[in-house]
Swiss-Prot record:
Native species: Nostoc sp. (strain PCC 7120 / SAG 25.82 / UTEX 2576)
SUPFAM superfamilies cross-referenced by the UniProt entry: S-adenosyl-L-methionine-dependent methyltransferases (SSF53335)
InterPro entries referenced in this protein's UniProt entry, alphabetically: MeTrfase_CN4_CS, SAM-dependent_MTases_sf
Single GO BP term: methylation
Primary gene name: avaIM
Top-level EC class: transferase
Name of protein: Type II methyltransferase M.AvaI
């Protein structure tokens, strides 16, 4: 018996409202439309015991060689990909797509299984992680590994006082202790003497440790600052604990890359009994790239889009983006290019390419009732940010465009697996799983299953403070093109 036979029906009991809102006509309308979708998908919802939060997040990758190099917390695990490919589908694929590739978990898992993997990623940090892993797997030579060993042993950045300027953003200024910043700049100067491949891998090693040697910690929507930081925005109370010494952190990271790479070399030709396949990465927004793809081309799509949770990756990964040379104007453009999941996103022009998707969204009753409620709350000054209604509208309208393109590029009979979370704003639960599944159905997909995790997630700390803690569904959607 496989883990995907350990499913059980689940009774949906979504109460999208607070008790003190029940008499509100806007809220009553939301509740009515929500219950209608619950009834529509009642037979598709399945509680899945093996889908823990660990397996649908980065946590399960922390012990996996290569996957553990960079802690990309928004990723799902390689174990999830293997479950979906080998246990759920139980058939061979030639080519799989991830339109939100992130750190490339799906790409490398499929490549190791002998499946051609294509990905699209807009953020430079994800692009860099994928590129460096490809370099180490496919281009690094024996002498390149020997150079890494020399760096590990000799610490050449400590043998001179020359420095290369560390790029900064307003949000990253003052992020490191002065002695750490000096070490970083000596390190950057030293790597300039290496060949382009060794240089890129060494810079990646530095990229992997930036948070651990800084005054900052990634905290959902922003960077949280330690009280020891020399800036006014640092918290008077927050103490992130030990800030690692630069030499200790960078040598341990180089050692980790070497150890995992030696394991890679010893197993380089065969994994799952087949030769590793190619990886293609397209560096841009999937809204730009997907329309360029051939119709009926992919055997499967496995993806996890950004959640509609206000997380701004240009802030949480600001240290890494600065090291990669991203400037202030680039940050503004990146925020606009990304899927609308932050309050700073401006409305995108979608009307020329996706009129059918927009028509479907305009008729989606639950979403439209939620948008009317949020606009009313905005007028009443009840929202903690005025950009929330625009963000939520943009998120679903853009996701509809992505879904319609995914439908177009999939072969007949092929599945789309999507990991996503429900969210809550202004005391209202937004059933992302039901809304997106309804959109997918209108586009032409068969909604095969909505696999629900046994334990959901809490709403944001802001929501808890005003409306109390409430568990929200976390799911893996399974849609299939007929």
């Amino acid at each position: 018996m496989t883990s995907f036979e350990l499913e059980s029906p689940i009774e949906i009991k979504t109460d999208p409202t607070d008790l003190d809102q029940e008499s509100d006509s806007f809220v009553q309308e939301i509740s009515r439309f929500n219950k209608a979708l619950e009834q529509r998908f009642r037979d598709k919802m399945r509680l899945h015991e093996s889908l823990s939060r660990k397996i649908v997040s980065f946590q399960a990758n922390k012990s996996k060689p290569q996957y553990r190099w960079f802690k990309y917390k928004e990723a799902f695990s390689v174990d999830l990909v293997n479950q979906l490919i080998f246990e759920y589908e139980k058939k061979s694929f030639e080519r799989i797509l991830d339109p939100f590739a992130g750190a490339g978990t799906m790409l490398f898992a499929c490549s190791d299984a002998g499946i051609q993997a294509d990905g699209i990623e807009v953020l430079p940090i994800g692009q860099e992680i994928i590129e460096v892993r490809k370099i180490i797997q496919r281009q690094f030579r024996r002498e390149d590994f020997l150079r890494l060993i020399e760096w590990y042993k000799q610490k050449p950045w400590n043998q001179h006082n020359n420095r290369k300027y560390l790029n900064r953003l307003r949000i990253t200024d003052g992020a490191y202790p002065p002695e750490t910043e000096a070490s970083i700049e000596r390190f950057l100067f030293s790597i300039e003497k290496e060949n382009i491949l060794v240089k890129q891998v060494l810079r990646f090693a530095l990229l992997c440790i930036l948070e651990s040697i800084s005054y900052t910690r990634k905290d959902g929507q922003y960077l949280r600052w330690d009280k020891r930081a020399f800036r006014k925005s640092g918290s008077d109370k927050f103490d992130k604990g030990k800030i690692l010494d630069f030499d200790e952190a960078i040598t341990e990271q180089i050692k980790l890359i070497l150890n995992d790479s030696f394991d890679l070399i010893s197993n380089t030709l065969f994994c799952y009994g087949t030769q590793r396949s190619g990886i293609n990465l397209f560096n841009a927004s999937c809204l730009k790239i997907l329309p360029e793809f051939e119709q009926d081309f992919y055997d499967c799509i496995i993806t996890s889009p950004p959640y509609c949770n206000r997380y701004d990756y240009t802030r949480t990964y600001a240290l890494e983006l600065a090291l990669l040379g991203v400037g202030e104007r680039d940050i503004v453009q990146l925020r606009q290019d990304m899927l609308s999941c932050t309050v700073e996103n401006k409305e995108k022009s979608l009307i020329h390419n996706w009129q059918e998707a927009l028509r479907i969204l305009d008729k989606q009753e639950l979403l439209q009732s939620i948008l009317r409620f949020l606009e009313r709350e905005l007028e009443r000054k009840k929202l903690n940010n005025n950009g929330i209604p625009r963000m939520i509208k943009g998120y679903f309208y853009e996701m509809a465009c992505v879904i319609i393109e995914c439908f177009r590029v999939l072969k007949n009979g092929s599945p789309l697996f999507m990991v996503n979370d429900n969210v809550r704003y202004a005391g209202i639960d937004i059933s992302v799983d039901l809304i997106l599944s309804n959109i997918a159905e209108e586009i032409g997909f068969n909604v095969e299953k909505i696999l629900v995790l046994p334990t959901g997630k809490g709403n944001s700390s802001q929501q808890m403070g005003t409306h109390g803690r409430k568990t929200l569904r976390k799911c893996v959607y399974v849609w299939r093109k007929p």
